Amino acid sequence: MFRNPDINRLAVHAGLRQLAWGLAGIFFFAVLLRAGLSPAGAFLALGAMLGLRLVTRPAAFALIRGAGLRTAMLVGCVLFAGQFPVLALVDAGRPWTIAAYVLAVAIADVVYWTCYHAVFAAAGDVGERGAQIGVRTVVMVLADTVAPVVGGLLLTWHGWAAFAAATVVALIAIVPFRGVSVPDVVIAEDHGPAPFRDGVRLFATDGFLMCGFAVTWGLIMFETFDRRFDAFGGLLGAAALAGAVGGLVLGRLIDAGHAARAVWLNLAAMTAVVLLRVALADTPTGVVVAALASTALFGLYVPTLMTAVYNAAKTSPCAVRFHYRAEAGWDVGGIAACLATAAALAAGVPARLLLLAALPALVVQAILLHRRYLAATPDAPTGAALAGRID
């Protein structure tokens, strides 16, 4: 894959983690609905999860400082695996089970994702970042094409088996990570918020989009197919396959020096995704067409965003602090999306119209990305943009 063995190991780890997520975790919102929560109630539960992540973040940072990045990452991996048995227990008739799931996911996420992003940012290579993220995305997409199909069938026939399989695979994902040479990261000094501002703003837009637009689309798909796990999982798998090519193509485009151009290409693609999903969300056939066609375009999104984020983290004074603060921004954006979506659904606004809220967020994100990519090439000659080296 790459000359960098640590990136290869992290890609395998990410693939196994995504396989575990696809077997059970990807269905979390659907499980909450089947457990008896209303759509608005499920969004409030997700918002509570993000709120808890936000307030427990200092404790996670203390763990990283005290135990080190490698140990904290291993703890995060175990906690990530532990969320699936708790999800199996959720029942709206027993509110404590939902509270337990919210707590389990919040603690797992706040430790795992801060560590994972910091490790990937520090271990990766700036000159190959886009391609490395693109390949990682393809590895994860391969997992996403299989796991939701299998997970949907298991949840339909023997629900406990899906959660057990996800737990085992998540624990196996620890094995490739143990071979990664985790870079030393100095986190004792507080550098203030300024060096990390780009990450916070970019992740806030991503949190808003993922918790609003992406989850709402999942709700539409699940409801369209009468809340059947098997049909929902099959559609998720087929849609994931359609998104693989975009990630690879755009990752190479970024590495070739066309990052700024890729930003606007991604904005156009994501705008088309939003409009396509809104237009076709009324019928099962339309939902299938929109899911397959739009996910192919959605494959451009992750490399465009995360190349900028990881490169900013690597050049920041501290990659751990960068992602600690950036993840907090993600939580704030996600909470805003969850509260707004829950209120709109409770007021009777059709879910398909709520997808349009993604459009202004995408514009803001594109502006931030464009500024970030241009700022990352301060020594480029005046004519570089016309020559195609930074645009």
Named regions from a protein language model:
Residues 1-51, 194-237:
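Helix-loop boundary and gating motifs at the non-cytosolic
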Residues 15, 94-112, 204, 285-301:
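Hydrophobic core of transmembrane alpha-helices in multi-pass small-molecule transporters
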Residues 44-62, 234-249:
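Central cavity-lining transmembrane alpha-helices of secondary-active solute carriers
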Residues 56-69, 155, 245-259:
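Helix-to-loop junctions at the C-terminal end of transmembrane segments
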Residues 78-92, 268-282:
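C-terminal ends and interior cores of transmembrane alpha-helices
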Residues 104-140:
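Cytoplasmic helix-loop-helix junction between adjacent transmembrane helices
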Residues 161-179, 352-370:
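Symmetry-related core transmembrane helices of the 12-TM Major Facilitator Superfamily/SLC fold
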